[in-house]
Design a protein with these regions (language model features):
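Short, structured helix-loop boundary elements
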Residues: 13, 17, 21, 122, ...
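Crotonase-fold acyl-CoA enzyme core
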Residues: 29-144, 176, 181, 190
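Alpha-helix N-cap/N′ positions at the starts of helices
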Residues: 3, 90, 111, 162-165
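Terminal low-complexity tails and localization/encapsulation signals of metabolic enzymes
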Residues: 184-196
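Helix-loop "lid/cap" segments that line or gate small-molecule binding pockets
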Residues: 98-99, 150-153, 168-174
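Glycine- (often His-adjacent) and acidic-residue-rich active-site loop
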Residues: 1-29, 46, 158
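Hydrophobic alpha-helical core bundles mediating ligand binding, dimerization, or RNAP-core interactions
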Residues: 20, 24, 28, 133, ...
Length: 196
């Protein structure tokens, strides 16, 4: 559903930065260079790192059982990677609401926001995703590769710069006492005690 938060507890900024570089930049590079459309199929919870993985795909299909969220802010962290793309997808004010409220939202709202491509009934989701993938696979591989690369270049011109800033912002937040307290409190299933 999301990132293993133990990976962030008691880590230095350098360790977190290297981890996030692999997670954000390397993931984007892999998705960008894969040469074929990628499809995220969500039939449960997608939070934090799960949202990062889903949003890196070209098409996002979700069932009515899908739920989404950016709970990092509840732990004293920042959902910084999503600052780069979410406002472009759903608009500044809606993005700010989702990113800074930490609230859970569901596939109906995600569809209305334009965050997912389609909402499919849960029992049909695997068949529908397979159908979409088969349809895409019947297209000219050269056209799909060139077209997808052009589409990504056009739509993600500032993505790398935004990701670099997001990694820095996340690291700055993740190493604060509040973030470490938020992470520990979550893992220990208690309310955080914030510094004031």
């Amino acid at each position: 559903a999301g990132l293993d938060l133990n990976l962030l507890v008691n880590k230095s900024g350098l360790e977190i930065r290297e981890f996030l570089k692999r997670l954000y930049i390397d993931l984007w590079d892999i998705q960008y260079n894969i040469g074929k459309p990628t499809i995220a199929s969500i039939n449960g919870a997608a939070r934090g790192g799960g949202m990062t993985l889903a949003i890196s795909c070209d098409i996002i299909i979700a069932s009515e059982k899908a739920s989404f969220g950016y709970p990092e802010i509840n732990l004293g962290l920042l959902p910084a990677i999503h600052f780069t793309h979410l406002p472009k997808i759903i608009g500044r004010y809606k993005a700010f609401d989702l990113l800074f409220s930490g609230r859970t939202f569901y596939s109906e709202e995600a569809l209305l926001l334009g965050l997912i491509s389609r909402k499919i009934p849960s029992p049909e989701i695997n068949d529908k995703v397979t159908e979409i993938a088969l349809n895409l696979s019947k297209k000219s591989p050269t056209s799909m590769n060139l077209g997808r690369a052009a589409f990504l270049r056009t739509n993600d011109l500032d993505y790398r710069r935004g990701v670099a800033n997001a990694v820095e912002d996340f690291c700055n937040a993740a190493t604060t006492p509040d973030a470490q307290e938020g992470l520990k409190a979550f893992l220990e299933k208690r309310k955080p005690i914030w510094e004031t």
